[in-house]
């Protein structure tokens, strides 16, 4: 049974039995710094997952999947093993935790052991649950990844689908960006 969403109550009871990642990321121009916010307060035992740093540095597009080797190194540095239950949360309007959840699935982490905190840090704080400034020092692990390349489609496959209609494509941008009424805040995508 996949538990892709876990409640704040569940996480509070299981904090000592999961690996926790704060994957907060903010759109450019918001004047918010996710790492500074993490240093001020985060859920106990959380490590900060930097979406900018932990994405492909070789692509001209932002936030592309990292290489298998880079993913293994990053996740090993967090002390996460292949058998750990990983819970990801964020404190951003773009729900960046879902992107990191997808990365774990792409690199074949057991789908039963990768979850997103329902409501994120916002809900955790609204419920007056405990936060800390203490930095979690993880012991390095030896995480092994295997790419599930079927989870990524290229431009040709997308274009072919316009004719074949074999799958539904969902654009997750907000309505203003979707209709071109608001500029793309990431200059690499203009």
Located regions from the model:
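Poly-acidic low-complexity segments
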Residues: 32-33, 50, 110
